[in-house]
Every structure is written in structure tokens, then in C-alpha cells.
Amino acid sequence: MRRDDAAPVGWAVSTQPVPYPAAVAAMEARAAAIADGTAGELIWLLEHPPLYTAGVSAKAGDLIQPDRFPVFESGRGGQFTYHGPGQRVAYVMLDLTQRGRDVRAFVAALEAWIIDALAAFNVTGELREGRVGVWVERKGAGWSREDKIAAIGVKLRRWVSFHGISLNVEPDLSHFSGIVPCGQTEHGVTSLVDLGLPVTLDDADAALRASFSKVFGPVEDAEAPV
């Protein structure tokens, strides 16, 4: 999923939590500028304050505790998800007219990016038919289960993507109990720290950056939109 011209993608990191409405406004403005040819592609890494977002397929019954955190309609694909401190959100603003107008290939590239980044910590990320995102199989004495470690939800406008992925590094996993995450009632959520790994957001950022370059091409430091 690389550009033919190998132009680098901007890589920006916000060091303070960004309110969701401000992030969406900045994303939409940047995506429009990319489509107009007045701005370059951008990957924007950030955290949000605790909140829930509803994708276009969200079901009202999956919002179990509507008063727990603010709830936002997102317009992205998918259902309900949680964002909050300790979770690395990466908003992906890429021009698919330069990379191939193939939505399936784009989502597969996002999955490959996450899986390769997890491998840096010796975590095997897996895909499951009919379940969006990246999963980790966990086994113990006489038991096994599959927990979600990363979510994917994107939107395209004029063939420019926005929204993106979220990777659970060290969020408060109890915050997911206010929703049915991504409509999955039979499976849980996990994080790198929950798996027993002493991983920081900086560690995750380094792995995500290295893996992105493998899948999508080179990056260069950029200023965060907010």
C-alpha cells in the first residue's frame, strides 16, 4: 500500500489528551486539504480523555452505561468503542488515489501494520473472520479465550482516509464495560500491559512507526494538528 512516488508521510504525536470534537474537526480539515492537494498525508498519534464513540453500525443496546463517559457519533465504520488514557490512537489520513483505490487492501494493510508492531513485543496478533480488529489468543490451564487488543475504524472521503486505529497499551480496561465493544459479547479486551509486558506509549509509538514504514512507506516528523 505504498505511493508510487515514495513521498514520506507526516508523523505527528500529541503529548496531551485531545478532546474528541477538536480531533475530528482537525482530521476532517486535513483530509479535505489532502484531497485538494494543499497538504500532505499524515499519521497523527494521540490519546483522548475517557469517552465512547459510536460508528455507523452501532446498536443503541450496546451502550450499557450511557452516562459513564461522553458519547460521540463518529461517522467511521464499526460499532461502539472506548478511547482513553493509555490507549494509543493513530488517525490515518492517507490518499488512496496515490496508493490504490482498494478499500479491502487498505484495511488489510492497517491490520498488517498493527500485527507487525505487536510482533516487536513478541505478541502474536491475529485476525478472525467476521470480527474487525486484531486479536490475541490467551490460554491457561484448561481454558482459552480471544481478547481484542486493537480496533480499526476508518472513513473515506474523496478517497482520503481519516479516523484509523487504536492500540491498547495501558488503558483502564474496566472502562470498556460501559459498552459492548464492537458488538462482540463473547470476547473480551486486553492490552500490552495486561499481557504482562512493561510497555509504554513511547515504546508502542516506536514500534508503530517502524512497522508503518514497512507497510506504507517512509515517514517524517510533522507537527500535530491540535
UniProtKB/Swiss-Prot annotation:
It is found in: Cytoplasm. GO terms for molecular function: lipoyl(octanoyl) transferase activity. Pfam families: LplA-B_cat. In the reaction, the free carboxyl group of octanoic acid is attached via an amide linkage to the epsilon-amino group of a specific lysine residue of lipoyl domains of lipoate-dependent enzymes. This is Octanoyltransferase. Belongs to the LipB family. Keywords: Acyltransferase, Cytoplasm, Transferase. It comes from Caulobacter vibrioides (strain ATCC 19089 / CIP 103742 / CB 15) (Caulobacter crescentus). The lineage of its organism: Bacteria, Pseudomonadati, Pseudomonadota, Alphaproteobacteria, Caulobacterales. Signal peptide: none annotated. It catalyses: octanoyl-[ACP] + L-lysyl-[protein] = N(6)-octanoyl-L-lysyl-[protein] + holo-[ACP] + H(+). GO terms for biological process: protein modification process. Catalyzes the transfer of endogenously produced octanoic acid from octanoyl-acyl-carrier-protein onto the lipoyl domains of lipoate-dependent enzymes. Lipoyl-ACP can also act as a substrate although octanoyl-ACP is likely to be the physiological substrate. It is an enzyme of class 2 (transferase).
